[in-house]
């Protein structure tokens, strides 16, 4: 990830580290904290060079203060509410802070809900890892969609919330456009259509207008961030699987620019907090800085005319076939029954062949999808 700060804070695998750039150009790093799983994103407190928050695939949100080099575990983001309590944690990819209110943070990850928390209500003494969200945001058509997740979040200067989904689009919600603390699980517990419809219409003060949508990029391969740019956050920016940096006008979603940012994929985009400079990074081994210094005004492109770039990397989508699952279960039963090791060897050989056959089928399936992916750069 990329963060622009007086001291460059970074996430490396499951570690949260601080890197201090010396006068001679050397960089010294020190460990501040860890997650049980990868840590994708940090959120720096607006106006503070010392305080920031991290989130990780363990669902944990941590608070850091560089003046003390200590980490405080605030809460674990839970998936949904059941009669017996909150279920398994959400694998978090994104965290952001409201620049108008540093007590408000939003997190998102392995499901469709972006959850907003008031950190003043968290247990800072470690007595509990539970925290109730104050609000949740999600496009109505994605509320029950289990195939999408959130890869990027950003608050604007107007407290609007920007959400980027994998295999989907980018959505902008007004400040009062949330669905309540736990809309998804509330319908499960009450279990009738009347309560469900009442949940969405109970408050006339909530802005239920359709969110602004930004389309044209492709967000399928990796975890991509999203951000606002401009002195008053007039624009929205995101990376794409086609190796470009996309820019839209915030107020109406009009596509403005697509700039070549990486040989493969652009993942991270961060604006400088004070000057008009953008940092971007992706699969390449460098970070690129962008400034509005062109001598001529750029021509506005038609997003439908953008040609995709051949990817150098591909994520494999591997699903265990039914016969492989049954074979594993049968092998386990035979081993527990004490059958001889020669049979186990034959089982393992057969199991390996099944895995290779499944991988071959998955490869052919991916190859057949290439024609669909090369129609344009848009995932829409």
Predicted features and spans:
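Conserved beta-strand position repeated across blades of beta-propeller domains
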Residues: 1, 43-45, 96-98, 154, ...
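Conserved strand-to-loop turn within each blade of WD40 beta-propeller repeats
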Residues: 9-13, 21, 54-58, 66, ...
């Amino acid at each position: 990830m990329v963060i622009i700060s007086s001291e460059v804070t970074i996430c490396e695998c499951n570690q949260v580290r601080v890197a201090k750039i010396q006068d001679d150009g050397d960089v010294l790093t020190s460990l501040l904290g860890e997650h049980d799983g990868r840590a994708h994103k940090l959120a720096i407190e607006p106006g503070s060079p010392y305080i920031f928050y991290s989130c990780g695939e363990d669902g944990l949100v941590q608070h850091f203060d560089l003046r003390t080099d200590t980490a405080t575990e605030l809460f674990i983001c839970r998936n949904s509410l059941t009669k017996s309590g909150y279920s398994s944690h959400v694998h978090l990819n994104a965290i952001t802070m409201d620049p108008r209110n540093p007590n408000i943070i939003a997190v998102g990850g392995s499901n469709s809900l972006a959850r907003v928390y008031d950190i003043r209500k968290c247990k800072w003494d470690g007595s509990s890892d539970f925290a109730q969200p104050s609000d949740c945001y999600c496009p109505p058509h994605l509320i029950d969609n289990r195939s999408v997740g959130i890869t990027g979040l950003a608050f604007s200067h107007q407290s609007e919330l920007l959400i980027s989904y994998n295999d989907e689009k980018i959505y902008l919600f007004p400040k009062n456009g949330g669905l309540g603390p736990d809309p998804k699980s509330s319908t499960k517990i009450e279990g009738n259509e009347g309560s469900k419809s009442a949940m969405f219409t109970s408050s006339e003060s909530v802005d239920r207008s359709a969110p602004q949508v930004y389309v044209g990029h492709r967000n399928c391969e990796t975890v991509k961030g999203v951000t606002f740019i401009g002195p008053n956050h007039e624009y929205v920016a995101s990376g794409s699987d086609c190796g470009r940096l996309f820019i839209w006008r915030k107020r109406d979603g009009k596509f403005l620019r697509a700039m070549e940012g990486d040989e493969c994929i652009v993942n991270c985009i961060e604006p400088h907090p004070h000057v008009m400079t953008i940092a971007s990074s992706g699969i390449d081994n460098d970070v690129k800085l962008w400034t509005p210094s062109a001598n001529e005004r750029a021509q506005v492109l038609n997003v439908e005319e953008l040609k995709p770039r051949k990817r150098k990397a591909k994520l494999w989508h591997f699903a265990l076939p039914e016969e492989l699952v049954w074979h594993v279960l049968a092998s386990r039963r035979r081993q527990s029954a004490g059958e001889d090791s020669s049979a186990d060897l034959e089982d393992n050989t057969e199991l390996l062949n099944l895995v290779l056959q499944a991988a071959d089928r998955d490869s052919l399936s991916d190859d057949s999808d290439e024609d669909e992916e090369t129609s344009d750069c848009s995932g829409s």
